[in-house]
Amino acid sequence: IGDGSRYDDEFVVEGWGDGIAFNDAGPYDALLVNDARVLGRSGVQDDPNSAAARELVRLLSNRGVRVNNGWGSGQASPLAEVIGTVRSAPLSDIVNEMLINSDNNTAEMLLKELGVVESGQGTRVAGLPVIGRTLAEWGVSLDGVRVLDGSGLDPNNAFTCRAMLSLIH
């Protein structure tokens, strides 16, 4: 079972529209492998959790491990046995990779993680106030600023030149 329940199931931002969603960003969730791409299939898969589970089953099968009942997406039982863990790279490395590669999925997941840390809710909506509050604490005027996603891809985002200069300085 691919369990991405740390975050909600908003895999793309509604405001992106068809030109951006599943092309420039998304789908993304708390469990994401290869940006939801599966070997042997074109494009990204609709459900990143299922795609990650499918990739794990493929890798295990290639190593002679038999997996019964295939793969899927859902929430793991609290009684499930942990068979492995992965430690995250340091946040500074993640942000560096995001900035160098213009990684929109990482930007969106970091926004949801802000929501988890601040409110216990892994949602874009829960993360957005953290952005506004932080900018205000840094002395950035929010007049004319509208942040609707983590990547900046939503066409209704707005960031003024004055806010950008204030942020840089």
Task: Cite the ranges covered by each PLM segment.
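A small/polar active-site loop signature that marks catalytic segments
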Residues: R37-H169
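Periplasmic/cell-envelope proteins involved in peptidoglycan metabolism and beta-lactam response
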Residues: I1-A36
